[in-house]
């Protein structure tokens, strides 16, 4: 089979994906693709498309769509970097294929003409891995029905002995698909370590879940540490040396990308550190209304961060968006206190970390009495729920530090939560 026999066919991406590997090898050989046997199926399909497009004087376009306020958009290879923009997407193409910000688009682009900076997308082959026609039928995120979380994300990792923190969370503050949880933490209470453990646990226990770690106004070395410590998750960051506009733009893009995945029935977990810093950044970029709350916070500044957090939901039609966001307290800033008070009660789960427990080097520094999950009966088995209620009744009169020490001591003697609950019965 020669190139002239294959190139005119210009097979769509979906047809290439449906072919078996030997058929793709045959096409690749005819197109003169080198080392095609070393490529995985998806990469091979893209390589074939690239060769076919090149033969017709076009280029393969692939990237995340960012739609501007003027109606047109750009494909950028990097989820966050506008400098990676390579292809212009006209308003007509966006309307024709019902494209939205955050969509991952594969298609063909006309190469830039003289004095043009970008090529232009002329044909869409796939949207988020779907056929373009199927993508047109997608429901809108805001039209989907939110329900209470009813499937627990079990964080316990049987393969490691260093899992007491996650075992405690599983029992006392169970996290479900679609949870909207706040991790309320003073400085140096172990919130970053807890987030890392949760991220690693979910990526390992639930391969079907897309995990995004969003770090806003964070130290650069913390970002590096997260990227090296967390495997299988997308770590997206805007460090403290970036302007507040960049913080907000990064968060907006992550928000839109997560919504696109959920619209197709996927499951996403966003770990945000922190909602407080995101609200601070949004306060700086929001046009002043003249109505200022205590601490210098504009009354309109919390609208978008609340929209971000409020997107967390379990979807009746399928899919879920789970958000675990840290809220900073006891920082000495009146603004931080106001932000926390505004977000208090918006979540359906709270993990409250205690400075007193941290000072006594008790980790997780979880205040058992103040932490909990709403409608936990939908997540835990009835027999587990009864034992948890009994445990909470026993420790209700204890000092939080003593209660956590006792609980960790008992749990440390068992290999997993099943054994611990069986021991409680005894």
UniProtKB/Swiss-Prot annotation:
The keyword Nucleotide-binding applies. Its EC number is 3.6.4.-. Belongs to the Rho family. Residues 58-131 form the Rho RNA-BD domain. GO terms for molecular function: ATP binding; ATP hydrolysis activity; ATP-dependent activity, acting on RNA; helicase activity; RNA binding. Pfam families: ATP-synt_ab (PF00006), Rho_N (PF07498), Rho_RNA_bind (PF07497). CDD domains: Rho_CSD (cd04459), rho_factor_C (cd01128). Homohexamer. The homohexamer assembles into an open ring structure. This is Transcription termination factor Rho. Facilitates transcription termination by a mechanism that involves Rho binding to the nascent RNA, activation of Rho's RNA-dependent ATPase activity, and release of the mRNA from the DNA template. PROSITE patterns: RHO_RNA_BD. SMART domains: AAA (SM00382), CSP (SM00357), Rho_N (SM00959). The gene is rho.
